[in-house]
């Protein structure tokens, strides 16, 4: 897939100059998402950088005018920041701040305001007696949570301080992305009267890790099934989608005795890599996952892992990796541009994404339509600038994987 690019607004200014923002009233950048814990005070910032004299602030929630006085909220003194004193689930939504200044009406990006939570049933302890020499797994059901929690497996000494937990396992043992703990084979070394295998979860909703389940391996039994140690699939990644710029992992976990070390190929080419490479199977999992330290668009393709431990038939698994990208600025736009009347100006804002983003523009917080502004491959061009062209120009780019918003103040002298 080609990495498409949209030249939304040119990265060069035709006429005019960029000046320090501290001389002009511009909004401070806001995050795309703000999380809150129920009943914990939380702030949605809206602050003018530069001259904030005579600024009037207002908010919208889900596209409608928002009267903070009718809710359990307040505005910070001398700024437009919205303070939720005891936020509730009903406060969730998409918020946007507006600042009316002598230069025009500035608008923030749309901010997603979401409750963070982690709901888990009381942890239970289960006793297990697996079959010696056979592949095995310990299940950990993922909790109902937002955002997605970090799942961690540990060996915990009964009655000991959790800070003393052991997190480094034998190379036979690897946690899968589904939350489960996989044993390539079980041995008597996995049996313990004093240690438990503990699965925990943590996200922004909690200060400490939450225990989801505990296991005690009390012993092992003999294998009478005739299993000879040939590779059997435990967890293998299916067709998957990855975001450009993210860390990505392709899993190829097979139980076997002796343990087999997967080899990875992309479109038939070896991609095992070395430990220092961007793509490598050398990441403390004995090759059971292929690590992309930073995912790039050109990583898209068909990947195959092959496992052969010398016993039975070699195993092979293939999947398609599709790479997508939220909108991203190729060059950061200018916050302030000063131009003289009668001159031409191009406002910079160049965006890329997979798929190509949809772009909309605004002028003083209203949709930009018609008028004398012209969209070209090099940007938003205004020829023969007039005093009425001054104000805040917003560039918003969206696709199904995210959005970007930047606003430029055009000052006409």
Swiss-Prot record:
Q: Which Pfam families match?
A: I-set, Ig_3
Tissues in which the UniProt entry reports expression? Hemolymph.
Q: Which PANTHER family match?
A: CONTACTIN 5, MYOSIN LIGHT CHAIN KINASE, SMOOTH MUSCLE-LIKE
The name on file for this protein is Hemolin
GO CC: one term? plasma membrane
Q: What InterPro entries is this protein classified in?
A: Cell_Adh-Cytoskel_Orgn (IPR050958), Ig-like_dom (IPR007110), Ig-like_dom_sf (IPR036179), Ig-like_fold (IPR013783), Ig_I-set (IPR013098), Ig_sub (IPR003599), Ig_sub2 (IPR003598)
Protein role: Insect-immune protein. Forms a protein complex at the bacterial surface. Can inhibit hemocyte aggregation.
Which cysteine pairs are covalently linked by disulfides here? 46-97, 140-199, 252-305, 349-395
Keyword terms of this UniProt record: Disulfide bond, Glycoprotein, Immunity, Immunoglobulin domain, Innate immunity, Repeat, Secreted, Signal
Q: Where in the cell is it found?
A: Secreted, Extracellular space
| Superkingdom per UniProt | Eukaryota
Which coarse location class applies to the principal site listed for this UniProt protein?
Answer: secreted
- Per its UniProt record, what SUPFAM superfamilies does this chain match? Immunoglobulin
Q: Which family does it belong to?
A: Belongs to the hemolin family.
Any Gene Ontology biological process: synapse organization
Q: Does the keyword Glycoprotein apply?
A: yes
Which organism is this protein's natural source? Hyalophora cecropia
Glycosylated sites: 283
Residues of the Ig-like C2-type domain: 25-112, 122-211, 233-322, 327-413
| Signal sequence interval, chain numbering | 1-19
